[in-house]
Amino acid sequence: MTKEIAFKKMPFLLMAVCAAVLVGCDEEEAPAPKQPQAAAVVEESGEECLQRAIDKLSGEGKDIEAADAAAKKALELMPDSAEARLVDGQAAYMKKEYKRASADFDAVVAEKSLPAALRAEALVSRAVVEIAQNEFDTARLTLFRALHLDHRNAAAWYHLGLLSRNTYQFDEAAVEQFEMAARLSAPGDPRTMKLSREVIPAIRASLAAAAASRPGAAKRDAGAAAKLIAEAEALRKKRQIRAAMKKYEAALAADPFSYPAARELAYLVSLNDKSADGVDKALRAYRVAIDLRPVVQDNYYAAAQLAYANKRWATAVSILDRAIAHDPENHKTLDLYIAALQKAGRDKHLNAWKAYRQELK
């Protein structure tokens, strides 16, 4: 799951010696009958139970049942300990007791007096539970909440990267998220090394291959496109908008990687052709612009706004889903996303998104 909470090792040596004396003596060395009977075991403290649970959850001596018992005991002895509740949640997760795990993590998140980083850890753990139950949309939002509390939480970035790559196919966002995870993790960590050496290069190679296979990519003519764009700009100044639109369209055909051609074509068509075919053409051009510059939020917003205005609610939601992957705290994007969710009848997560939006104020 998430990185383990570090606790200082307790001084077990003296306790172990005492226990050996109490339970290891011979019959002849036993106390006289009239003397009080010595205890057979030494009661562990809450901190010791907690450390034992952590030890049993990881490492060579991993034992989930023993960890679970120790975690429950630690929580019983320290019911107000956020750390004990987090470890109990981890043990519950390992046993696939997801309801109990979620309750533990939610309790930590709800305690607003706790450090933001600790609450973020609980949210990441909560998201992992949700992923295990295939609640991917819920998990993504939970991870956004974690990053709002602690932008340097490497585990949150890592799990977002997994969701972007494996569930949503937002590969550009996955690269950004995995890079953040690698940057914030220990350099020698095996997962960090795998991200940097294998995962990120593989996604980049896939993106490059997809770009190379784009229609017209092999015969692109950037020079011709630049000339056509200049002609389009001259026509716009003369208010010959229809002619300018044709020039931008020709420029994009000459060079499918021309971001200015895609962006300006989308903008002009959306303003000047209100027919269904015009909306389709504008949305296609916006998608090209988005593919070429996936971090530019304005293109997502303009495309989604166009879809929303034409009652294409599901299209607006789809566009904004991708926008949010790159910038989950953009207020304007979120407001339109929530409105589109409501219009599309996507009520399952609507209240959760509204609550998240309130957290950002």
Regions found by a protein language model. Give the residues of each.
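Helix-start (N-cap) detector for alpha-helical repeat units in TPR-like alpha-solenoids
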Residues: S45-E47, A82-E83, A116-A120, A154-A155, ...
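Structural signature of tandem alpha-helical TPR/SEL1-like repeats
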Residues: G61-A70, K95-A107, Q133-T142, Y168-Q177, ...
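Canonical tetratricopeptide repeat
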Residues: V87, E121, S125, H159, ...
